[in-house]
Each structure stands twice: as structure tokens, then as C-alpha cells.
Amino acid sequence: MSEVWRLQTKTEVSEKNKLGNEVAKYCKDNKVIALGWTLKEDIYNSFKNKKEIDNKARNIKEFSDYEKIIREYNFFEGKKGKNNVRRLSCDLIKNKEKERNENLIWLKLDGEYYLAKINKNSEYIYNQDSYVLNNLGASNQLTNVEWHKIGDESVIPGCISTSFIRGQALQRIKKNAALKISQILYNKYIEMNYLSTEIENSSENFYGLLSPKDCEDLLYFFFYHKFKYIAIPSTNKTNTQTYEFVMLSPKNRKKKIYIQVKNGDSEIVDLYLEDYQKLDGKVYLLTIDGKIYENKEKKEKKEALKIEFKNNSFMKKIDSTNTNKKIYAVNPEALYEFAKRAYKDETILMPQSILQWFEYLK
């Protein structure tokens, strides 16, 4: 079965040389996937025969050669870098002979996303070029990888964009719908008739395609549609931990409404009621993949709130603030149904960045 991956390209050497984006650029221009964990510094710092080790490094043909060196001379033992090299040279190419079912991989460069497939000509090499070794520190490579620009974050599914925020240098994207949407985009932008596939129109798949920002916007546009609440733009600060922004009601501009939204792998998606007790206004909490707890102690005890939305109601009161303002949990399923309705009903105001994903949901 094919898989979809993503590549983080900043290596320790490239960061030290202040060449953070150069590894990604090198990958794109040279049609390779390149990783760090070269043996150069380990050989230099070794008390053993440096020339002997260097000769062995020059003869690396596959991962087993690389692994033999780091085991024999106790390089990188127990470190995660070795696993990244194994993924590159073994796991990533395991489907390369399966035409139209090859593994796909994403790369990010200067805010743009690139997509490639691993083909039958892709081979692992240990590149000893001096610039690669000394400046980029990215000698572990997979060759013959053709990168194609898909676009910026506005056209990239949330399950793809959020996968770049943390994790290993090279890792699978396991989020639901990630593989299928990658295959669909490859088919749309790169190779017509490459692979025909569909994604089930379900709330799980829909939210998997939304970025965290799209999810915030979706909840806001529901409130605008339902209650005509208006957001105060200056309250949407990235350093605000407890809410996304503040809204005002047209019925009473003195009353504030706060929302908090958690979606995707980019952040911790659990919410804690204790964080909202001091807010002086109504609070609406939405978490797609997480749970809501009274506090962090309750999470340690695995005592999440049991929230039941009767008749698929949009929200449910779960607590109050210190000033007796209501705190609500928002029903993701009901919000998804609203988004589906907005896709068909053009009288409902909704940004295209959200609606576009229904084109791929069948």
C-alpha cells in the first residue's frame, strides 16, 4: 500500500552555517530528497583511524553500509537520526516499482509546497560532494525525485501543512485522507490520469483537510450567519493562548464573546475549563480531535468531560466563568453540517479556502 510522507530539510550543519532554506532549495533544484546525519564531524572527532573510516564512508551504497559504520565506531547510537536515514533508504522506496501506487512526499520551500512521487529510478546514495557535506550537512539522499510546485498554504490541506510544524525530519503523514488528497492533487496538478480516487464526505475527512485557521474561520462564519456577531480584528493575536479572538453582538456591543478552536496535529488539541474562568463574556470551545477537561489534573486522571449533543444540537453549556457567563462546547458534527449547507447555498457567507475541499469530498 502506498504512503504519503513529508520532509523537513533544516539540518544542524545548515543551521550552523545560516543556510536554513538552502537544503530545501538544493533538493528541488537537484531532484533529490536530502537528509542530515553525515559522518563528517564524527569522523573528525573520532580517536580511531580517520582515514580508514572515511574510506568506508566513501563506499556507502545502502543503509546497511551506513548503519555498519555507525555501529562499529559508535556514531549516533541511540539517536533518532539513524531512523530517518533508514526511512529514506528503505521505507520510502518500498513501493517504487508499483506503477500508479508509488509513495508520495511533500516539501516546503519559502512558503510554497512541492509534491513528488518516488519512482523506480530513485536510489539511495551517500553524497560526498564537499558543498553538500560541509555546508548543507545533507549527504544521505534519494535521487531522481521530481518536485512539482502545488502552491501556498491556501490550497494545501490542513493535514499536510500542519505535519510540517513538528516531528521527525522524514515522517509519514498518517492523518485520515492525507494519502488520498495527495494523490488527487498529484493527479490534478502534475500527471493527469495518474490515479483516480475519491474521499468520503465525512466530518473526519473534512476537518482533516481544514487548516487550524480555516477551522477558526468556519466557526466565526457560523456565528456571523446565526447571530451576526462581528469579530474585533485587533483581538486576533498569535500570542493569545486562551482564545482566538473576541466578537461583539449587534444587540449589545458591551457584551463580549470569546471562541477557542483546536484542530490538526499542529498544536495540543485538548482544552481546559480553568483557562477560561477569568474571561468576562460568553465562551465557545471547539476541539476536533481533543477532549475538554476541568483542569490538567483531571487530564492526568483521564477524566474528560462527557459531552452529549442531543439531536445533533450545535452547542451545549458545560460551565460558567467567574462572572457567571456561560461556557459552551461546540458540536463539530453540527458545524460540519453547516459547512455542507454553505457549500450548496451561496447566500451563506463562507470563504473559498473552506468550501474548496468539498470539491474533493464525494
Regions found by a protein language model. Give the residues of each.
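Mixed-charge (Asp/Glu-Lys/Arg
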Residues: S2-N101, W106-Q241, V246-K362
